Amino acid sequence: LLASSAASDVYKRQVIKFTVALTAFLLINHNIGYMEKISSTPIALILALICSILPVGGAVFIGSVLILLDMYALSVEVCIVALILFILMYILYFRFSPKNEYGVLLTPICFGLNIPFVMPVGMGLLRELYSMFSLVCGIVLYFFLNGVKQNETTLGGVDEKDAATSKIVVALNQLLGNREMYLVLAIMVVTLVIVYIIRKMSIEHAWAVAIIFGILFEAVGMIAGDMVLGISGKTITILVGSIISCVIAFVIQFLFFNLDYSRTERLQFEDDEYYYYVKAVPKAIVAGTDKKVTRFSGKEEQDRMTKKRFAEEMEIDEDLLD
């Protein structure tokens, strides 16, 4: 049974990696597929199959190569700017957030699907604070590529006098002069921090509260920020994207943190040095009769337990008792 379960997990991971990689490659081909030889669906399928047997970082690397080739087909100057950007991103990524490859891939994908708000909420629920660096990389990458797409006529024009310098300035301006990108970076990073802090709190329905606060902060912040920057026509998109992101976030909660608060147990016990007061909330997928809960009192010296024994008895992480 264990072998069968392990094999099933391997296949599931491969399917997930294939799906994410294929979606990323198809979006690259659709939006910036300037090199026609590599911008076909069969090529995307083959590369996604290769990525399914590689670590997730393999998809990030292959996606970077595809983008650089497309940028080269558009303009050598844009390719150089993109290469410098990727080098800086890889330094930031490998230094602070090497185990959050999905964040780098999924963030531009979610932007392309108009549901970017799910990323800071989802990462705040499932990851640690340092995952914000992969989120930042994904946001910067999306806005750079989107800016290149919007200015492809200028960037892909025939070389003229001073044209090379002009192309570099236009490419750099997609990053350095993009006020909307700075707005999105600030709001999404703060959202991730808010969601992370709330879901760590010892309150009932912490994940649900974190999701609601996070989505509301993003929606209100983006609408207000767009008004300040004079960006119009995005309110409906923001509201619809927020609703869809909220639904996805609650699906994440159901899959990873589905608790039954109606069966909450408050426990007290002691060891030689401390008294412990613990609130134990069972998972909703576990039947009430499947778990035996033993209550410990300071008056029952024979039932004293160390934190380690208690954690083993309750099948919880010992660190949760700290």
Regions found by a protein language model. Give the residues of each.
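Hydrophobic transmembrane alpha-helices
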Residues: 12-64, 70-71
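Alpha-helical transmembrane segments of multi-pass integral membrane proteins
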Residues: 13, 23-26, 40, 226-279
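Membrane-interface helix-loop-helix junctions at boundaries between adjacent transmembrane segments
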Residues: 49, 62-136
